[in-house]
Amino acid sequence: MTMTDPIADMLSRVRNASNAFHDSVTMPSSKLKAHIAEILKQEGYIEDFAVNDRKDGKAGKELEITLKYGPTRERALAGVRRVSKPGLRVYTKSTNLPKVLGGLGVAIISTSHGLLTDREASNKGVGGEVLAYVW
């Protein structure tokens, strides 16, 4: 069966694994998912990620994300929300970039310069499609 929104699936898997206090989560990989994982790592929401060959021997790659927790096992990733969906795309101008929790969270934006956080997009003066909010 074809997946209609692979980004929402990725974010749901990460959120569910974090809520269940799993050490890592595995999912089918793509370039876009790897870029999102890179942003999550840069912003300190996940420990690490790796793109590996599938363990079952089938064609394709899988993305393994190692989740991050504090010293007393508190979650680094408090919440995540998919904004732009296949049925309703959400775009923003560079002058209207969203702030997540007053700047405490991060908006992931797909721009002509690649995937950027809201702060990076503001510095470069570009807008784009708002993919997700992470806090």
Curated annotation (Swiss-Prot):
Gene that encodes the chain: rpsH
TM region positions: none
Keywords: Ribonucleoprotein, Ribosomal protein, RNA-binding, rRNA-binding
Subunit structure: Part of the 30S ribosomal subunit. Contacts proteins S5 and S12.
PANTHER family to which the protein is assigned, alphabetical: 40S RIBOSOMAL PROTEIN S15A
Pfam families in the record: Ribosomal_S8 (PF00410)
Example GO molecular function: structural constituent of ribosome
Family, as annotated: Belongs to the universal ribosomal protein uS8 family.
Cited InterPro entries: Ribosomal_uS8, Ribosomal_uS8_sf
Organism this protein belongs to: Corynebacterium urealyticum (strain ATCC 43042 / DSM 7109)
Protein name listed in UniProt: Small ribosomal subunit protein uS8
